[in-house]
């Protein structure tokens, strides 16, 4: 009786392992079943699920749309092997945003590649298609404001870091667009590349950059770091007691945008 009730409501997804070769952050090592395993899981899930889905993830900040077509092709191989057409296909996340050294193709090219891959499945009726836009949807909506606590030549020690909102600037080495908040003082037109160091005791609290800022930046200056609407607030910890929960809503434009043909070229890194 319990199994019958579950059968009426249960939605199961089998996550398929696909290549993350074009992603800045590889998410393929922990999750995902190879094609032969996924086929067996799909057959098993068919016995119990009300809705059955296949999903994949091409990795975070995917820089080439072809990855989605390749993922859909793997889905097609599983469908051919099992003769089971899923109710849902989830093409996952990975949709990119723009950073100074990472300029993706227009978002429409990603959608075109997905549609092409789905068409190549040659199914009489397509399943429901879902996706998980993250960075591409919300990255531009948030910034972090940091204070320069100390300058040592081209090293800036700031009051946030990899244990705070700037995790992606650490190990993945994402370079955020940056600009000094002038606050009434004269800012040099000469630019210099800087490394950042966070406030904690850990030497890993380091952000290589390069972060391009005016040469005359000094202690107590404030810097805006953009593209932190995704994975900024969610990564904060209270390690060493450093934690900021001050959030303000403003209505100015983002430092960079991928949804405007006139991209702000002064923030791009060659």
Residue ranges and their predicted role:
Residues 64-80, 106-115, 144-152, 212-213:
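Short, electropositive alpha-helical surface patch
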Residues 1-88, 113:
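Active-site-proximal beta-alpha core segment in soluble small-molecule metabolic enzymes
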